[in-house]
Amino acid sequence: MLIGHFTEQPWQDDNSGLMGTQSTDLSISNEHYNPNVGAHLYNRYLDEKVYAEEMGFDALMLNEHHSTPFCMQGVTNVGASILARITNKAKIIILGNVLPIWDDPLWLAEQLAMIDMISHGRLVSGFVRGGGRESYAHNSPPHFNRERFEEAHDFIIKAWSDPGPFRWEGKHYHYRYVNPWARPLQQPHPPIWIPSTVSVETVKWTAAHRYPLVLLATKLEPTKEAFQLYHDTAAELGYESGTQNVAYLWKVHVDETEEKAEEVGRKYLSGVSNPFLAGNEGQVNPAIMNLPGHTSVSYTHLTLPTKA
């Protein structure tokens, strides 16, 4: 079993007056942002990752979101590249780069290859489709989200694995000359993980590629169903999957004593900081999260409505 350290790296500033805000996506002006506080938080979160490695965590996990204070990391590759240099043992797991918003996946392939080399082969590269927030904020057409995800994935794998130069003429990406000088240390490429929240298509696609499926704080019963769908798909494709093929993001609060941890944890679950309470839209306005064309009819929104 691999245990990793993960946090959304949220904005924290009591003077911002954002506690209890109904929605934290695209509706809060960045006039509330204080660069001095931001500078402190970015360095603090990096220090936490270094400490997590010292405490024995197997992996340091990073993600990215855009135009929202609940996740300060808008460019996950920046944090990953810093950790590649200042840590020594732990895997660096990106959960993950939002492929559909990248207009230049060759540039992404080069960045990730550099991170893998600087870390001496510790990179695990996660790829995600992203939510409606990312498409909305970066002017990416939601109805082509899955197509762009799959084509960008195929291109990056080829750029990492096949000798160049070669030409790429796809539906969404076109290159006259592909010959990245930066190639990953791990050959033919770093491990790929696929985080999801979850859709039938994504589960089956992930199983078909034999990538680990990472479910992000989804309800337990649908999580079991999704994992079983993965295992069933693997069996249909002729291989036996196991615990090495699935992962789960679990929320944990640690404090000085068990009693204090439970007290603070319950305040989080039942207080204004819980984005899923009745009358609260949550981190994402549903109208933005589920943009037309972004999700299929098979999609079930499984993000955990946490209860005390």
Give, region by region, the residue ranges found by the protein language model.
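N-terminal beta1-alpha1-beta2 module of alpha/beta enzyme domains
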Residues: 1-87, 190, 301
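Flexible, glycine-rich active-site loops centered on histidine and acidic residues
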Residues: 2-38, 101-167, 212-215, 219-221, ...
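Hydrophobic faces of well-ordered beta-strands that scaffold small-molecule active sites
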Residues: 3-5, 60-62, 92-94, 123-125, ...
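Active-site-adjacent beta->alpha loops and helix N-cap segments on the catalytic face
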Residues: 74, 78, 221-226
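Acidic (Asp/Glu)-rich catalytic clusters
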Residues: 82-88, 116-122, 207-208, 238-239
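Conserved, mostly hydrophobic/aromatic
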Residues: 83, 115, 156, 192, ...
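Aromatic-lined glycan-binding groove of carbohydrate-active enzymes
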Residues: 201-207, 226, 243-283
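Conserved small/polar residues in nucleotide/adenosyl-binding loops
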Residues: 300-306
